[in-house]
Structure formats: structure tokens, C-alpha cells
Amino acid sequence: MIKDLRARDIMIHDVHVTTPSDLVAAAKLKMMRCNVGGLPVIDKEKLMGIITHRDILLAGGEALGLKVNDLMSKDLMVVNMDTPIKDITKIMVEKGYQRIPVVEDGKLVGLITQSSLIRAVADMDD
């Protein structure tokens, strides 16, 4: 049943990431190549923030020459692997988040996206 699912059951394990010192232009290119709307920002295995395609668009063309650290969101909502899916869904709906990092001991272990959540619900019928 869906109410029994936890973050660990639906999270994306192979997460595309960037670093604070990468250029925004490189992060944008990686998002396009990987077909993702945002990248967690990792420094020495620790989650530092997230940068999204929307962040880059809102900042304008001059943002492409900045470092990811200058543009990333640092105040993140994160969950752990045991967070119930119903809690994650509530957060995503109420806050309008499209992705939520899954962390253990400050380290990124996965990512919950709207797509991964929908896929999990759709798979419940199988």
C-alpha cells in the first residue's frame, strides 16, 4: 500500500549533481543533457544546496558566468530515507516543491521528484 511506502522506496538513487565551484553555465548544460530541472549541489559528499533551471532563468543571462554557489538555494527542505511518502507528498503540494533531496548524515543519498512520486503511485496498480 502507498501509505506504507517510504522515501527509500521511490527515491532516485543515481542523482546528477554539481559543485559550488562549477559555473552556472556548466550546470545549465548538465541539466539539459541529463533532462533534469535541477541539480543538488555537493561539496565533499555534503549537500550544500540546489540549483534549478528556474533559478537560472530568473537570474538572467549574466548568471551564466557566475559560480553555482552564487545562485543556488541554500535553505533546503530535505527528508531522510524513512520519511513516509504521505509526508513527502504533503510537503511537495503545500510548498510547491518539484524535488526534495534525501539525506543521511548530511550526505545526499537520493532525490524524490514529482515524477518519481507519480511513478510509484502508478506502479501500485501492477
Where are these regions (language model features)?
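Bateman (tandem CBS) regulatory domains
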Residues: K3-V15, L66-L76
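Short beta-to-alpha loop/turn elements within the nucleotide-binding domains of ABC transporters
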Residues: L5, D22, I51, L66, ...
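ATP/adenylate-binding site constellation spanning eukaryotic-like Ser/Thr protein kinases
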Residues: I12, K44, H53, G65, ...
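Conserved functional loop/turn residues at catalytic and ligand-binding sites
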Residues: D14, N35, D75, G96, ...
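The conserved cystathionine-beta-synthase
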Residues: V17-N35, I42, V79-G96, V102-E104, ...
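Residue-level recognition of oxygen-bearing side chains
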Residues: L23, K46, P84, K107, ...
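Short hydrophobic beta-strand motif reused across regulatory alpha/beta modules
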Residues: G49-R54, Q98, V103, L111-L117
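A short, polar/charged loop-to-alpha-helix boundary motif
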Residues: I56-N69, I118-D126
